[in-house]
Amino acid sequence: MSSPPEGKLETKAGHPPAVKVAGIRIVQKHPHTGDGKEKKDKDDQEWESTSPPKPTVYISGVIARGDKDFPPAAAQVAHQKPHASMDKHVSPRTQHIQQPRK
């Protein structure tokens, strides 16, 4: 395989086109530059630092205390599939398939 020319790179949809080897298209993946990620991280930190205070939640006229009222273990039990109290007894039935004679 030949390396792409260092000068002007031909791009399609913002990335270099795939290379054909033995009739199969092979995509060459190159690592991205880290400059854009650093800028995004700085912007994310600014938004995270200015979060509004959590509103108080009232349940039946009483202030909810969050995890103290509803522990995570209780929430897990509520979302688990209920088990059957009686096991299903499947009676073995022979299935007869009627077919025409030869």
UniProtKB/Swiss-Prot annotation:
GO terms for biological process: apoptotic process; apoptotic signaling pathway; autophagy; negative regulation of autophagy; ribosome hibernation. Residues 92-102 have a biased composition (Polar residues). Residues 32-43 have a biased composition (Basic and acidic residues). The keyword Acetylation applies. It holds the Pfam family DAP. Residues 1-102 are annotated as: Disordered. Phosphorylated. Phosphorylation by MTOR inhibits the suppressive activity of DAP toward autophagy. The modification N-acetylserine is found at residue 2. Keywords: Acetylation, Apoptosis, Autophagy, Phosphoprotein, Translation regulation. The modification N6-acetyllysine is found at residue 29. InterPro entries: DAP1/DAPL1. The modification Phosphoserine is found at residues 3, 49, 51, 91. GO terms for molecular function: ribosome binding. Ribosome-binding protein involved in ribosome hibernation, a process during which ribosomes are stabilized in an inactive state and preserved from proteasomal degradation. Acts via its association with eiF5a (EIF5A and EIF5A2) at the polypeptide exit tunnel of the ribosome, preventing mRNA translation. Involved in ribosome hibernation in the mature oocyte by preventing mRNA translation, leading to ribosome inactivation. Ribosomes, which are produced in large quantities during oogenesis, are stored and translationally repressed in the oocyte and early embryo. Associates with ribosomes; inhibiting translation. Interacts with eiF5a (EIF5A and EIF5A2); inhibiting translation. Belongs to the DAP-DAPL1 family. This is Death-associated protein 1. It comes from Rattus norvegicus.
